[in-house]
Structures are given as C-alpha cells and as structure tokens.
From Swiss-Prot:
Positions of ATP binding: 19-24
Free-text comment about domains: The N-terminal region contains the highly conserved SGGXDS motif, predicted to be a P-loop motif involved in ATP binding.
Name of the featured protein: tRNA(Ile)-lysidine synthase
Organism placement in taxonomy: Bacteria, Bacillati, Bacillota, Bacilli, Bacillales
The species this protein was found in: Staphylococcus aureus (strain MSSA476)
Function: Ligates lysine onto the cytidine present at position 34 of the AUA codon-specific tRNA(Ile) that contains the anticodon CAU, in an ATP-dependent manner. Cytidine is converted to lysidine, thus changing the amino acid specificity of the tRNA from methionine to isoleucine.
Length: 431
C-alpha cells in the first residue's frame, strides 16, 4: 500500500489523527515502517467521542500501542451530551469540536502537517453525498489531498487508495484495529451510500462509481472559477468599513450577476464577519427576488446582531443598531465642537446668542423646515427621500432646533441660509 507522501517534508513534525479504525491504523503502521524516514517527528491525536461503550477500550489500546512504539499521544474526550439529550445529529457537532481541538493542538505542538486517513472510497461516498443532499453547488465536490487551516496544513495520503487495498494490507501485516459497529447501520445516510448504493453501482458492468472522480475534477474547476470571479467582484464593487463592521455593494451590479455567483459573493461577504452563517440556496433565491424588486428600502434580519439593509442603490451588510447606544436628544448651551451619534457638529462662536440653547435630536413625525431662498416649508422625510438617505442613517442623523424649536439644520443635508457658516455638520471621520 503506497502513500502519497508529497504533502510533507523530511524535516516536518507530522501529526496523525488516529481513530483506531482500520484506515488510520494502517496509515500509522506505514508511517512507522516504510515511511519512517520521511519526517522529523511523529505525534498521534485521538478523539474519544464518549458515545460508544467501546471508546474507553479503544483509547486504552492506542495508549499502549503508542507507548510501545515511542509515539507521543494526546487524547481528547468530547462532551456531546447536549446534542444527545436533544436528539440532534451529533456528526456535524462532533466534527466541528474535533477540528477545533486539532487546531488547538497543532498550535501547541508547533506541528507542520496533520494527516488523516481518508481514502478513495471516502472520496466517492462524499461526492455522492453532496450531490444527493444538494450541497454540491457551493462546496467542492469532495476532498482535496491538501487543505489549509490556520497555521498548518491537512494532508490525505490515502486518497488514491481503495478500501479493498487497505483491507488487503491489514490482512497481510496483521495490523490491529477496532471496528466501529455503527458503520454497519444504514440509518445513517453516509453508511447507506457506502454499504448499499456504491456496491449496487459497481455490480452493474455499465456503471462505475469511479467516474465520479471526473465529475469532481470538472466541478471543482468551475467552483474555483466562481470563487475567483466573486473575489474580483468584491474587489471592484464592495466598500468595507472595518471599524464599524459595515460593508456596502452596488445593488445594480449585484443584481446583474448570475444566481450562482451571487450566492458565492454573499457566502464570502457574510463569512467575513460571522463564520457560522449557513444560508440555504432557497433562502438566497428569495432574497434575490427582493433585491431585484422596485422597493427602495427594506431590511432582512440575518441574526440577532446582523442585518442586510437595502437602501436605494445599495446593498448593505451591517451590525444591527442598538437604539440604546445612540443619542436621541442633546442640548447645546454654548458654541463648541460636539459629537451626536456618527456626526460631528461645529457650533461657531458667531452664531447669534438668541438661538441658544440649541436642541439636537433625531427625526420626529411631521418635522418640517423653511426652504432657503423661497417661501414655504418642506418635510424632513421628503428631504430624506429626495437625497436617498438610508433608513438607518435617518434614525441617527442630527436635527438642530433653535430656542424657539424651529429646525435650522438637518444633518449635512440642510442648514438655514442665515446661519449656514456658523453650524457645520459632517459625518464623524470625514475630512
């Protein structure tokens, strides 16, 4: 059984994820024998999921095995009781926690490469699983031999080796291992694919499950093209405000994209601020209909902390505004520089004293101001509409009233002509 050892170097500290199953034990055996000179140091990681009664015996077996072969071993016991109590599927949660621990240990060990025992049959199973459960359009279709994590790489040296070859290798060298009895239970989708569907395909002389590898190659090339196109679009059309955790994109430019590229763009943008966003394709398609509608302003709640705000020609992803964090009313007794929400107010000393105290507040229903240079009044709400001011900006913009409670300034949109040079309002941070 030949490993693909191109993923590490002779001076690397390699770490092997060992479950005690036949695949990982055969991988470990090869690393200790035929490939013992291909690395500088070898360490084992083992996760005890604490779900099966055999887990304790497996962990103890691996401790003895590693001690006999002078291998450093680290074991982690996961607590999955919360998912079990709620009858949730533990597979995804276990995988997340497992890789969180791998990340932690690779950093602690200052290791270079993590090896896993995924093999050819795992690859075919994963391809089929992603096709049938609808997760093929926004993911690669299977495993890559090499993938990158924070500070290290994951390599899969058995990815071209079939399960049949692994079994033959184990029988030849009498390699000890444990069989997970749950792998035979077809109530789990992956087991059903592995134990029933793939063998049925292989029994038909006109069909070959291995042809899925060609589909994977084609699919992954298209996936990479989409990823590149999304990055190009983001670079050209998206503006970021890192401090405020705010980004905006041209609504028209976004609407002109094909739906497949829209999904990739949003996946990239949402993951920038919140890694656990998991928006379904169906939800995305509903959003796209709203984005392309004629409605000028509306919002979509992502979580309790994040929102998508549509404002005229802009699509904005931003943190939700917590009303308690913004000024609603402020009194100014004398000239000076003041901050109101995200605006800076410069009140000049030449402003007539009879106008003080000034009241600075956010908008209220029915607000009007006197037009400059002509008779009549205009509603503040109409001014916002004419200037295409986003809804959330309207809620923060300072409106300045004089002692008589007459509006003399509306943010950076309007100042009464007679006092224009003495009240200067600008967005905080603008030059």
């Amino acid at each position: 059984m030949q490993l693909n050892s191109n993923g590490w170097h002779v001076d690397d500290h390699i770490v092997v994820a060992v479950s005690t199953g036949i695949d990982s034990m055969c991988l470990l055996y090869q690393l200790l024998n035929d490939y013992k000179d291909s690395y500088r140091k070898l360490t084992c990681l083992h996760v005890n999921h604490g779900v099966r009664s055999a887990s304790i015996e497996e962990a103890r077996f691996l401790e003895v095995y590693c001690e006999r072969h002078h291998i450093d071993l680290h074991i982690k016991k996961l607590d999955l009781s919360h998912s079990l109590d709620r009858n949730n599927s533990i597979q995804n949660e276990a995988r997340i926690k497992r890789y969180e621990w791998f990340d932690e240990m690779m950093n602690v060990l200052e290791a270079d490469v993590l090896l896993t025992a995924h093999h050819l049959d795992d690859q075919l199973e994963t391809i089929m699983y992603r096709i049938f459960n609808g997760k093929s359009t926004r993911n690669k279709l299977g495993f890559d031999e090499l993938s990158k994590r924070k500070g290290y790489q994951i390599y899969r040296p058995l990815l071209a080796v079939s399960k049949k070859e692994i079994k033959q290798f184990q029988e030849r060298y009498h390699i000890p291992y444990f069989e997970d009895e749950s792998n035979k239970d077809n109530k789990y989708v992956r087991n059903d694919i592995r134990n029933r569907i793939i063998p049925a395909i292989d029994e038909n002389n006109q069909l070959k499950a291995s042809h899925l590898l060609k589909l994977k190659q084609w699919h992954d090339e298209q996936y990479d093209i989409l990823q590149y196109s999304a990055k190009q679009f983001i670079q050209e059309f998206v503006k970021f405000d890192e401090q405020s955790k705010y980004l905006e994109v041209s609504r028209q430019a976004f609407n002109n994209l094909p739906n497949s590229l829209k999904m990739v763009v949003l996946d990239c943008l949402l993951s920038k601020y919140y890694e656990l966003f998991n928006i379904s394709a169906k939800t995305y398609e509903e959003w796209f209909k709203q984005f392309s509608s004629k409605k000028a302003q509306f919002s979509i709640n992502l979580t309790d902390k994040w929102i998508i705000q549509i404002a005229y020609g802009k699509l904005i992803i931003m943190a939700k505004n917590n009303g308690d964090t913004y000024f609603r009313v402020q009194t100014i007794e004398k000239p000076g520089n003041y901050i109101f929400n995200k605006y800076r107010l410069e009140i000049h000393s030449n402003l007539p004293k009879c106008l003080f105290p000034l009241t600075v507040r956010t908008r209220q229903s029915g607000d009007t101001f006197k037009l400059n240079g002509r008779d009549g009044y205009k509603k503040v709400n109409r001014l916002f509409i004419d200037c295409k001011v986003q809804q959330w900006v309207r809620d923060q913009m300072p409106i300045v009233l004089d002692k008589q409670q007459r509006i003399i300034a509306v943010g950076d949109l309007y100042q009464q002509q007679t006092i224009k040079q003495w009240i200067i309002i600008s967005k905080n941070g603008d030059e």
